[in-house]
Amino acid sequence: MSGKLVIGNWKMNTRGDSARQLAAALLADGQTNREGVGIAAPAVYLAALAEQLKGGKIALSSQDVSRFAADGAFTGEVSAAMLADVGCRYALVGHSERRQYFREDNAALLAKMRNAIAAGVTPVLCVGETLAQREAGDYLNVVREQLAILSDIADGEYVVAYEPVWAIGTGKVASLEQIAEIHAFIKNWCLQNAGGSAKIRVLYGGSVKAENAEAILATENVDGALVGGASLDADSFRVICQAAGKMI
């Protein structure tokens, strides 16, 4: 495991044509078409993008994975085995938007983590506090509770992404001091408590843009970035990936 990891989370954006055009632009650029770069696309476009990305180096990620492992009567779900079958290398788990809108709890997220690992897909566990929790000084406890499921992972590789909820899509960015503090906390907690991977990557997410990426990625214990809106613009995403590439 070397170099920074940058994953672009497209969220519920793009259509078929625009997804293909964006992927084509990323494939055509050496800064984005390389190891250590991934895109988390909407589920309906994963199969088409997997075909398009063949021969390139960009990793494909899903934005979620089912908590149900076996095939069966789970309408609307996409299993980890299906994601692996289509070519996904990563799967986001527990993004704050899913925690908020779908009330995902630790039990469901642990099942998702285990299913992804069993299928050979690397889960990216998203953690982070709200503004109220930050201002109340409770943010470390919140993140600790979200990380707790890693104690029940017996084996396998995974990634952690710290995304302060108050910085997602708001234009607000945590200070470099805040980022350094929480990333050190996450790594120390994982070293003492987490199972599975002995060396865990911790990404930062939350209004990562072309203009702030280099400073964020240079911060101690930041192993990469989970990029939202900026990943929908090929030029902006290129600058972020270029900044990450300098730090290999």
UniProtKB/Swiss-Prot annotation:
GO process annotations (BP): gluconeogenesis; glyceraldehyde-3-phosphate biosynthetic process; glycerol catabolic process; glycolytic process
UniProt record similarity statement: Belongs to the triosephosphate isomerase family.
GO CC terms: cytosol
Protein name: Triosephosphate isomerase
Compartment annotation: Cytoplasm
Subunit structure: Homodimer.
Listed PROSITE patterns: TIM_1, TIM_2
Gene that this sequence comes from: tpiA
Pathway it works in: Carbohydrate biosynthesis; gluconeogenesis; Carbohydrate degradation; glycolysis; D-glyceraldehyde 3-phosphate from glycerone phosphate: step 1/1
Enzyme class: isomerase
Upper classification of the organism: Bacteria, Pseudomonadati, Pseudomonadota, Betaproteobacteria, Neisseriales
Keywords: Cytoplasm, Gluconeogenesis, Glycolysis, Isomerase
Organism: Chromobacterium violaceum (strain ATCC 12472 / DSM 30191 / JCM 1249 / CCUG 213 / NBRC 12614 / NCIMB 9131 / NCTC 9757 / MK)
InterPro entries linked to this entry: Aldolase_TIM, TIM_sf, TrioseP_Isoase_bac/euk, Triosephosphate_isomerase, Triosephosphate_isomerase_AS
UniProt-annotated catalytic positions: H95 (electrophile), E163 (proton acceptor)
Predominant subcellular localization, coarse grouping: cytoplasm
Function as written in the Swiss-Prot or TrEMBL entry: Involved in the gluconeogenesis. Catalyzes stereospecifically the conversion of dihydroxyacetone phosphate (DHAP) to D-glyceraldehyde-3-phosphate (G3P).
CDD domains named in the record: TIM
Protein EC: 5.3.1.1
Catalysed reaction equations from the record: D-glyceraldehyde 3-phosphate = dihydroxyacetone phosphate
GO MF entry, a single one: triose-phosphate isomerase activity
Residues holding substrate: N9, W10, K11, G169, S207, G228, G229
Family annotation (Pfam families): TIM
